[in-house]
Amino acid sequence: QQFLELLENRYYTFYLDEWVFQKEYANETLQNHFEVKNLKGFGIHEVKNGIIAAGAVLYYLSETQHNQLKHIQSVTRIAEDNYVWMDRFTVRNLELYTPNSVNAVTLLDVIDKTISPMGGRLLKRWLALPLKNIDAINKRHELVKFFIDSDDFSQTTTYQLKQISDVERLISKVATGKASPREIVLLKDSLKAILPIKSASEKSTNKTVQELGKQLHTCKDLITKITETLFDDA
């Protein structure tokens, strides 16, 4: 009783029935959401606890937030062997994000030179999950070296990234039906700003950059649709 009282005073709680945590229900929930016959394509079909957790999260979101969850398009298993795992005490003691004293400088403060909200979030995830695979580490280093050595490419990419709004946030608002006309215009402008990055990447001499460029979708139909529907000063 004391534990429950303490829990209720410090945290928000939301009751879920036991059937929400059954593997069969969770599996069906995920398959229906992603519109697939099985979860093999996501590499989680044998991860029982992961399936249950992901299914419960989707159910919780549908009950408490909204039914429009189509912007959640994938589920990925974090392979423990690929990353260095750190508990919250280690993260705190290393001062990765939060300083332990008033005048201290965190690692994030030192290395965060990102120029977009998406890049900032990605860097935080990379700090939280350091790579263990040497090839993957070297691949990142080679990309950094390419940006340093290729002034024209670096300048083009930097300039275009500065024209891009927080696309992840905008897409989430669109999916939930909460985006304003002005935000839709910002999304269009952001998609247009990606096109020069895609072109420069595909023409680069670095194979990894070329592959990244090929993965960028032009979204030309969407850009045209928004342009024909809304004025820029909407």
Question: Model-found features: residue ranges?
Answer:
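Charged catalytic and DNA/RNA-contacting regions of genome-maintenance
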Residues: 1-146, 159-175, 179-234
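Conserved interaction-surface patches within small, structured recognition/assembly domains
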Residues: 148-154
